[in-house]
């Protein structure tokens, strides 16, 4: 494990934050809401042991699709089994792999699930015999009974869930505070302070894994970073964070997102987020090589990086005055693709939050992200956030 230290002073207690600035990101919150207790883990080592154990009981292979026999089970007419070359025992598809199998042969999974098993078996068998790709890649697991965890095209590039978790453990240890990277603390809405020192429980953890995927979110919230001052003179504090995800059975891409943020609330929304960067890797033929040469090094680089460029960028944006008059403000925004209505709303947002009209690039960035938070349409929100990011980058 690479033990990392931070040059920023350690927080000894909760610290004041201003969450009216930056973006609100709900990805982690969506994961938090959807995970049952058996998908929540209290440490990275527990998470790793689970996903590593299932990988050790699994094996992948490529077989001819026409060689697969689909049968309705003898003791249950509602279930299907697959008989594949080299296996004496029939293999039971999971709910997920059944849907993948239907997709491979061009059959609608929802409709197929409604058919009696014998009829569904006939349809799937026909599809496999006439499958144009001729080959499929299976992921089978022996967990007391043989189970088909995934079935994909032959070019599918698998990245194992335990490989991602292992990469994170190299920089984060157990994720419980033994390094600077840990499960995040919680925002106190009454005092508007972020408390890094919260017990890790099933309710607060951000380390998740199911039979389809893995997702984890860690922060360095015990070393807050000051990047300028608020209008009242208090420091504007941030900390670093990242989340990562993968599916070894093909339900989603592999990805890593890194950012600076100001707080994490109890339902795991990210507040006051800036400098959001994301890498995604599709599970194509060379996915494993891309993970080894791109994603894993990018994660380590972010973990080891200095916040100095981020602080300098924020400082430059605060200091760069671009508009002192109302006409200048309108011209500045209209030239950057904002409609007349949007221009007025951005200026109103800054007036409301800062008590004065926007003057610096940073003021305009905060106004644009505040406007983005009011948008329910995701495409509109992302477009505004993209404009804010581009504007902030132009200052440095």
Question: Language-model segments: which ranges?
Answer:
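Feature for intrinsically disordered/low-complexity regulatory segments and propeptides
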Residues: 2-167, 171, 197, 360
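Intrinsic disorder/low-complexity polar-acidic segments
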Residues: 158-396
């Amino acid at each position: 494990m690479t033990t990392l230290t931070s040059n920023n002073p350690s927080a000894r207690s909760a610290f004041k934050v201003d969450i009216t600035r930056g973006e609100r990101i709900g990805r982690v919150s969506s994961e938090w809401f959807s995970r049952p207790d058996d998908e929540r883990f209290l440490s990275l080592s527990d998470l790793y042991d689970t996903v590593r154990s299932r990988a050790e009981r699994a094996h992948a292979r490529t077989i001819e699709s026409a060689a697969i026999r689909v049968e309705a089970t003898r003791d249950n007419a509602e279930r299907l089994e697959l008989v594949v070359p080299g296996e004496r025992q029939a293999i039971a598809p999971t709910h997920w792999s059944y849907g993948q199998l239907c997709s491979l042969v061009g059959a609608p999974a929802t409709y197929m699930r409604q058919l009696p098993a014998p009829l569904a078996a006939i349809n799937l068998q026909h599809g496999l015999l006439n499958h144009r790709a001729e080959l499929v890649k299976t992921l089978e697991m022996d967990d007391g009974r043989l189970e088909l965890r995934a079935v994909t095209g032959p070019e599918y590039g698998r990245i194992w869930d335990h490989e991602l978790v292992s990469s994170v453990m190299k920089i984060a240890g157990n994720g419980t505070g033994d390094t600077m990277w840990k499960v995040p603390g919680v925002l106190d809405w009454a005092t508007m302070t972020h408390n890094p020192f919260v017990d890790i429980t099933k309710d607060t953890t951000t380390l998740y894994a199911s039979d389809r995927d893995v997702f984890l979110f860690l922060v360095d919230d015990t070393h807050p970073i000051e990047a300028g001052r608020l209008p009242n003179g208090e420091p504007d504090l941030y900390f670093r964070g990242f989340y990562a995800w993968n599916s070894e059975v093909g339900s989603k891409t592999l990805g890593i997102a890194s950012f600076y943020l100001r707080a994490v609330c109890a339902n795991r929304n990210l507040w006051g987020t800036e400098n959001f960067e994301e890498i995604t890797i599709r599970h194509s033929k060379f996915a494993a090589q891309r993970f080894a040469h791109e994603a894993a090094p990018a994660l380590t680089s972010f973990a080891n990086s200095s916040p100095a460029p981020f602080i300098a960028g924020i400082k430059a944006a605060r200091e760069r005055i671009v508009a002192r008059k109302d006409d200048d403000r309108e011209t500045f925004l209209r030239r950057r693709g904002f409609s007349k209505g949007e221009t007025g709303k951005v200026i109103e947002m800054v007036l409301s939050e800062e008590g004065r009209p926007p003057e610096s690039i940073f003021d305009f960035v905060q106004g644009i992200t505040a406007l983005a938070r009011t948008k329910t349409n995701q495409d509109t929100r992302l477009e505004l956030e993209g404009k804010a990011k581009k504007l902030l980058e132009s200052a440095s």
